[in-house]
Amino acid sequence: KDRLDANAVAAQVPMGAEDNFWGVIDLVTMTAWDFKADEKGMTYPEPMDEIPAEFADIAATKREELLDAAASFDDELMEKILMEEDFTVEELKAALRKGVLANELNLVFVGSAYKNKGVQELLDAVVDYLPSPLDVEAVTGTDPDTGEEIQRHPSFDEPFSGLVFKIMTDPFVGKLTYVRVYSGRAESGSYVVNAS
């Protein structure tokens, strides 16, 4: 929390460190994953039957911190936690997502991209917690023909609008244009007007 100057909460606990890093404990599901060194991250591991005893205490402590953080964003979840009632993983993820979307909670994940350990879990977390295009508010622009201010919502049903943010030439493919699409669809071979 001090280093990041943010409300950082662990979503995972590492098993091992540095060259001896061999697994991850997911605090949302309380599942442990053993990334076998001889597989070099080529296969997705099966969850372990239980959390190893030497990591049980730290996992329980960090899980409590995660639940406290999640409960502050969802009153129903807070009530269930206080009353010691069961709650689902989906309810916990939804509460955590509220905090992340409000930019009031920063979940911390562990892994090694070099050894492909914990990478899939991180990518799953991107889907579970970070904003999707549907969470983004409508963008406002100007109609190039009328000068009228218009809004585009992130929907396939809206007319196409986008922003070219990079153009490059590839020796094998030719000219490549990178576009941030705000609404609609761009079909192959279609013409798009540059309004600027």
Protein language model regions, located:
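Structural and coupling elements of P-loop NTPases
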Residues: 1-196
